[in-house]
């Protein structure tokens, strides 16, 4: 027995500890990650009209956005409603939790004496989690008290939750640490309230409206800046707007006469002309009045004399009464229209066009102009250019109806540019060589079939445009145009060029839409056999046997052309052969050679170059289709 008592006493003696005691073991606090605490407000009474009718529309609330918060949270908005009707301050109801379901409801009353911003925690503190029994009792009491208040209030029938009441008297902005989306979940109760639309997806400044019943929420700005609300003394108070506007017309100024409009200023010369015309009109009117008076006087005198003669009475001649003419006076402030009338003249279209062209020529003559442009006048005949024959340098007669080359152009001695595009001209006269200083000549889109030899006598010609005509071949005399730099022969049925073109110094050659491709060369160079007289004449000339034949026979042996290869006499047409070369920036330009005999034909067929130009230059020839083993049919006749 004693031993047991001793053991019990021994066990009751605690050993002396040399360290701090451990804290008591408390039950583990569960991690309520998904549980959300809801703020609940006490129901308020219905507002009166004079209470919410005096709200300041300039008040606004700002909510700061935090970039650390997930952007997938629900959008928020705020609405201004009045909950405390005894106090004149406004309160804002906001939702502090994003989710509605699976949350516990509890009440959080914010006192009116709060003067600063509030920080709403994400979850409750640890002490509230531990003493949940006490909190549950507090909830029950709050529910009972709220039920009593709901029964006392006849207008409110449903309890609001998930809301936080913020008084209007908060003058300080929310702290920067509280950066969350706030969504409005408050549904106003009663028949006098209207639901506000939901704003989703963005935020904006929320103004406090005058009428809470018809207040429409605006988005809250997404900027991170926080602007403090203005003080009550700085806000503008609404003033009663007048319901009726009375306009007093008794104080209007008396009616005044409108000032007389001032006539526009006129040039001195125009004023002088108008004054002279007015004076002439006045003189004519005076002359007409005098004539009328004289006629009336003569008629009256004759009538009186006849009456006296018939009656046989001798009465003294009485002066006739003068005719009185009333003159209308024009006041200084009267408006007078002054102008000139033009009588309509019946004229045909050709006469009108001819008058316009004549006027253009007269203007060139008066002002000393050296260019005349009559493009697009559709002239059937060229006007007389004699007045400007020595001064015109540029003449454009394109897009007209000239059927023939205008002879009037040949008298323009100093003409340098002549354009005759789009005219139905069929022939160019050989007298065109009279235009000695002509540099640019364009006669495209006509019906020209042949270029005259006089055209090749223009030593200063630099550009020749004969495109889209009906030219089939060009004379070898083109080699005389040593100043020619640009030749345009597009759109012509031409198959080849003469050898004289190799002597030119062309910079640009255009041969588009022509028959110059190699498929037409063989057909274009087909030869016929020479006549016997032509062969004999060529044999006598080359062997110098003309002195041994009679004169009658010698006259028939005259040569009319020259061989393009040996430059000797050529009787008849001779033989034709096409060789191509790359020249003037164009590849495979076909050159048609007219030779006198089969010997020259064989030589030019086998050669690979030609010497042309001044100074003489070597031009390579392409050995394309002429490399056939079979000799042309012309050789069988020799």
From Swiss-Prot:
What InterPro entries would the database entry show? Leu-rich_rpt, Leu-rich_rpt_typical-subtyp, LRR_dom_sf, LRR_domain-containing, LRR_R13L4/SHOC2-like
Question: What segment(s) does the record annotate as region Disordered?
Answer: 220-241, 306-325
LRR repeat extents = 389-412, 413-435, 437-458, 460-481, 482-504, 532-556
Q: Which domain of life is it from?
A: Eukaryota
Sequence intervals crossing the membrane? none
What are the record keywords, sorted? Leucine-rich repeat, Repeat
Q: Name one Pfam family in it.
A: LRR_14
Q: Which PANTHER family match?
A: PTHR48051, RAS SUPPRESSOR PROTEIN 1
| Protein name from the UniProt record | Leucine-rich repeat-containing protein 63
